[in-house]
Amino acid sequence: PYEKIGAELVKEVAKKTDDVAGDGTTTATVLAQALVKEGLRNVAAGANPLALKRGIEKAVEKVTETLLKTAKEVETKEQIAATAAISAGDQAIGDLIAEAMDKVGNEGVITVEESNTFGL
């Protein structure tokens, strides 16, 4: 029963990460799997599940706090291109996204659709 709960948790983590950030699902999934695995190992060794949960929640708060303190705004076209290129794994795609964002501005909307036409 714990394994099924763990699998559902990992699935929910990936979905929420995708919904909120649009990227990082692999990292979030790996972290969630490690938390579930180590959590189950600790519970099997006699750890109090509620104390473990509280500890994880405190750790999440600290990590979130640290990430927010060290986060940097992505403001310039070059920064947008670099960030998008990392996410896409392709500099040309990063440049294209930066160009599109430059044209529509901060409040604009960019729609990306899959095409069956090669090269377009």
Swiss-Prot record:
GO molecular function: ATP binding; ATP-dependent protein folding chaperone; isomerase activity
Pfam families: Cpn60_TCP1
EC main group: isomerase
Family matches, as SUPFAM superfamilies: GroEL equatorial domain-like (SSF48592)
Major subcellular location class: cytoplasm
The reaction(s) this protein catalyses: ATP + H2O + a folded polypeptide = ADP + phosphate + an unfolded polypeptide
Known EC number: 5.6.1.7
Keywords noted in UniProt: ATP-binding, Chaperone, Cytoplasm, Isomerase, Nucleotide-binding, Stress response
Described function: Together with its co-chaperonin GroES, plays an essential role in assisting protein folding. The GroEL-GroES system forms a nano-cage that allows encapsulation of the non-native substrate proteins and provides a physical environment optimized to promote and accelerate protein folding.
Name of the protein in question: Chaperonin GroEL
Protein species of origin: Mycobacterium xenopi
Gene assigned in the entry: groEL
